Design a protein with these regions (language model features):
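Short, flexible loop motifs at catalytic/binding sites
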Residues: 1-180
Length: 180
């Protein structure tokens, strides 16, 4: 059972129920439950993609965190076991940070250090966790403008989402604690 507190529920409602937000940015304190919230949003996006035909391209959800150890150690057990996605995945690999589902849907865990691997690909939903700690590699603004946001906007535009029968165009959740 998924249990979100009122502040988490408000963000979730705007992203997935009312679809008022396409790009949500949330700054919250330690202990707020941002990892849980981010995982719930990513899993919701996976279920939206599972409704689409196998031939629809770019059915990928990404979760990005500053390092691979962080994204793998925090999100893999949360998604696989706490949220029960091990029951829905055709295959999953903690080492690769990947979950494969029916209809060519994939959830990928990616370090910010490797964010350039997204270049040229398509993303239906992207979680970017702890942006304030993403300091290695290209700058955060450049990563958003030249890599992350284009994977969402170009492959999952309003027009393409309508053509594919998707619930919404691509979206993202940038969620972080303030640094310092």
């Amino acid at each position: 059972m998924i249990n979100l507190h009122p502040a988490q529920s408000e963000i979730y409602k705007h992203l997935f129920v009312e679809q008022k937000l396409r790009y949500a940015v949330v700054c919250c304190a330690r202990g707020w439950g941002k990892s849980y919230m981010a995982a719930v949003c990513a899993v919701t996006a996976v279920f939206e993609l599972l409704e689409l035909a196998a031939k629809v391209p770019n059915k990928t959800v990404y979760i990005i965190a500053p390092t691979y150890d962080q994204v793998k150690d925090i999100y893999f057990p949360l998604i696989a076991y706490d949220l029960g996605m091990e029951d829905y995945a055709i295959k999953m690999s903690r080492d690769l940070g990947r979950f494969w589902f029916a209809n060519n849907v994939e959830l990928r865990l990616l370090s910010y250090e490797s964010v350039e691997r997204m270049r040229g690909k398509g993303s239906y939903f992207v979680v970017w966790d702890e942006i304030s700690s993403c300091t290695k590699g290209i700058g955060a603004e450049d990563a958003w403008m030249s890599v992350i946001q284009p994977t969402i906007a170009t492959r999952w535009s309003n027009k393409r989402a309508l053509a594919y029968g998707a619930r919404s165009p691509g979206r993202s959740l940038v969620i972080s604690t303030p640094k310092g």
